[in-house]
């Protein structure tokens, strides 16, 4: 790689880390404050969790059309507009003290985020050499972990000194400045070719990706995986505010530093993919998550912290594996749609399971809630299987028919 190529590579690398930080800061700063939103707006835990779930629902809906926008505006322009609008809407999210106004702004934030997510992996596929792609995607996913954990921690610390509305303005303002830096640093696409694109092409791309045995199983599995991750982080603040812990909000925010282990998980699995690109890595990451989740049911504080560390390591390792699997196995003419469909399943799982699981938590309590989620992770790992470079959910009826012939 010559000096010009190195400079471009590092500009891309720095920019996507910054973009990940911006997106996931605006997305997740509300998560550790769900208990406060519940009190401020007189909402149940499940209803208060809509401040996150409504955003991820909108994100999933936006991803249905974001590839069309990405193709027409170009990768960089789509990402820049997405980041700027996301930050502005976040600053406006609590200018009116009403729960439904907040939900409206969070919905619009989700729509804007979809533009970035529909473009970033495709941009990397187009602009980064294949031998470096796995590592760069791993670093990008690590950036998402960093953005999420810093946003959760900073918002928890800020809310001890400022109103929720002020916290929204501070985070939105900081990411607005960062969005302009992203605009300046990210190189223009040099390998992007604008296609003649109609909505029928979008539909065909989604269907081709959904029917592809190599990637369909990942879509389904990650729907549940990210939903479980969101559920644990949505509601863990409730048991931490009660005996034997009785922590205040700023202390609870520090627990989210444990999820920085996701950076290690992303980087480690990003390297492993280059040497051992097999779906068994994904199954291992799900089992790691299950072990970590179970540890959070302990009344021993260090077990809870260790559990969160292991749990976050597992989810970000699985994200890296899944993102690379889609990038390498998606239909060659439908890369953008395949990545968008992955994100749709990802965020639908986050919103639907993250919201509905709140009722399980209310009904069963923390320990049984966690054992149910961990059991689902183990079941998913068991049902997934790899056959050469194919990936599919285990179909017992199909196997039975095969054995009888």
Where are the predicted features?
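Helix-to-loop junctions at the C-terminal end of transmembrane segments
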Residues: 63-74, 265-277, 361
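A late C-terminal transmembrane helix in Major Facilitator Superfamily
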Residues: 329-366
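Cytoplasmic helix-loop-helix junction between adjacent transmembrane helices
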Residues: 105-143
């Amino acid at each position: 790689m010559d000096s010009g190529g190195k400079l471009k590579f590092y500009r891309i690398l720095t920019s996507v880390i910054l973009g990940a930080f911006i997106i996931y800061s605006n997305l997740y700063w509300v998560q550790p404050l769900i208990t406060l939103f519940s009190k401020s707006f007189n909402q149940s835990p499940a209803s208060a969790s809509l401040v996150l779930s409504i955003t991820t629902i909108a994100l999933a809906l936006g991803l249905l059309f974001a590839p069309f926008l990405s193709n027409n505006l170009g990768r960089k322009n789509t990402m820049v507009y997405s980041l700027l609008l996301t930050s502005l809407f976040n600053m406006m999210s609590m200018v009116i003290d009403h729960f439904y106004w907040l939900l409206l702004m969070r919905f619009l934030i989700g729509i804007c985020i979809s533009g970035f997510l529909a473009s970033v992996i495709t941009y990397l596929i187009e602009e980064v050499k294949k031998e470096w792609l796995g590592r760069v995607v791993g670093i990008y996913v690590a950036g998402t972990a960093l953005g999420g954990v810093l946003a959760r921690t900073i918002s928890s610390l800020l809310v001890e000194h400022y109103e929720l509305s002020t916290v929204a303005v501070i985070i939105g303002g900081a990411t607005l400045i960062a969005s302009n830096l992203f605009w300046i640093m990210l190189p223009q696409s040099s390998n992007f070719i604008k296609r003649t694109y109609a909505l029928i092409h979008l539909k065909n791309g989604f269907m081709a990706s959904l029917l592809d045995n190599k990637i369909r199983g990942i879509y389904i599995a990650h729907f549940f995986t990210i939903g479980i991750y969101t559920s644990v982080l949505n509601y863990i603040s409730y048991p931490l505010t009660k005996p034997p812990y009785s922590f205040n909000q700023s202390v609870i925010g520090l627990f989210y530093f444990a999820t920085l282990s996701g950076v290690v998980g992303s980087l480690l699995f990003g390297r492993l993919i280059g040497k051992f690109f097999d779906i068994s890595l994904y199954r291992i990451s799900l089992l790691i998550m299950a072990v970590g989740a179970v540890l959070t049911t302990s009344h021993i504080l260090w077990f809870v912290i260790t559990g969160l560390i292991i749990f976050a390591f597992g989810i970000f390792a699985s994200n890296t594996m899944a993102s690379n699997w889609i990038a390498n196995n998606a239909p060659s003419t439908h890369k953008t749609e395949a990545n968008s469909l992955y994100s749709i399943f990802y965020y639908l799982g986050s919103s639907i399971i993250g919201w509905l699981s709140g009722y399980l938590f209310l009904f069963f309590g923390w320990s049984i809630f966690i054992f149910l989620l961990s059991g689902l992770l183990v079941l998913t790992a068991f049902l997934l299987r790899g056959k050469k470079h194919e990936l599919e959910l285990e179909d017992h009826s199909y196997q039975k028919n095969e054995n009888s012939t």
